[in-house]
A protein has these predicted regions:
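Conserved, structured core segments of small domains
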Residues: 1-98
Length: 98
């Protein structure tokens, strides 16, 4: 399962603070880079999102909890919506329903 993990640094948090924590957690092995399928920072910094692959939500929590005192998180499970299959399904539903 994929999870969309939006993040925003708390006010007063610096790049150095985030950098130190990132390296600390990396060295402890808690970042699980094998689960991070994408990591994007928004223009201007201090915010962005990650796409994390995990079987269970608690596996995502294991990654983000060590950052919760300096970063706010908003996490949502994601489901892929294949475009062509979705169009065909919508056409079928509209034909049957109306």
């Amino acid at each position: 399962m994929l999870f969309y993990c939006r993040f925003t640094w708390y006010p007063g948090v610096s790049r150095a603070m985030v950098g130190r924590r990132l390296i600390q957690q990396h060295e402890l092995g808690t970042n699980h880079p094998e689960r991070i399928k994408g990591w994007y920072t928004l223009a201007g910094g201090g915010a962005g999102f990650m796409i994390v692959e995990a079987e269970q939500p608690h596996e995502v929590s294991e990654i983000i909890e060590p950052y919760m005192d300096i970063i706010a998180w908003d996490v949502h499970a994601m489901a892929e919506t294949p475009y062509e299959a979705t169009i065909e399904q919508m056409k079928k539903e509209l034909t049957m329903g109306g």
